[in-house]
Amino acid sequence: MAPKFSVVVPVYNEASFIPKALPALVAEMESLGDAYEVIIVENGSSDDSAQAARDAAVDAPVEVQSLDSADYGNAMYQGFKASKGEWVVNFDIDYFSADFLRRVVALEDVDLVIGSKRDPGSEDRRPLIRRIATRVFNLLLRTILRSRVSDTHGMKAFSRALIDDLNDEVVSRQDLFDTELVIRAERAGYRIVEVPVVVEEMRSA
């Protein structure tokens, strides 16, 4: 039986951080009580990120992939392609939330759930320069591409049907992969819901 959640986490040169973060992510997933898999996609690291993930994932449903070159978008693409879950989730190694997934399963008739930093009720506790950069990027996105989505980065949960339909259609890689995937989903008429989140990355917490 397919797991409820496939959590895809790209990592790059995170060997020192993974021993803290990956067990915390596993604990968050265990708190949900649903079957899950975590797919760590190490991409082009010069350290031992992949081995650190294997060591930190003992007795947990964690798969570790390694790619030759550093490419965040390709890491997401490959992780999504390998996923089996009903919901395919994009988390970062320093930014994840079981509460976000509880919101996902509480929704009905939806294909993409975005944890939007711009949604009313959200709290963005990141450094000011990062908050400004996010606002500028999303303003350009809405202006140039006429998107109604307020935030294409951060936590996202995609339905199995959406991933099976659109993952192979995305041509962008690096930091624009998920942006293109969200825009394609919007233009294809998939049902998108944005929910509030609290953004406080573990490194700065």
Where are these regions (language model features)?
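Short, well-formed alpha-helical segments that are part of the catalytic scaffolds
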Residues: 14-29
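Catalytic donor-sugar/metal-binding loop of nucleotide-sugar-dependent glycosyltransferases
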Residues: 147, 170-173, 182-200
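Active-site acidic Asp-centered loop
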Residues: 43, 89-94
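Cell-envelope/extracellular polymer assembly enzymes that use nucleotide-activated donors
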Residues: 4-6, 37, 180
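A conserved acidic beta->alpha catalytic loop
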Residues: 42-51
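Conserved sequence signature across two-component system core domains
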Residues: 7, 11-12, 41-43
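Acceptor/aglycone-binding surface of glycosyltransferases and processive sugar-polymer synthases
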Residues: 67-82, 87-90, 98-175, 201-205
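Donor nucleotide-sugar binding loop of glycosyltransferases
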Residues: 14-17, 45, 72
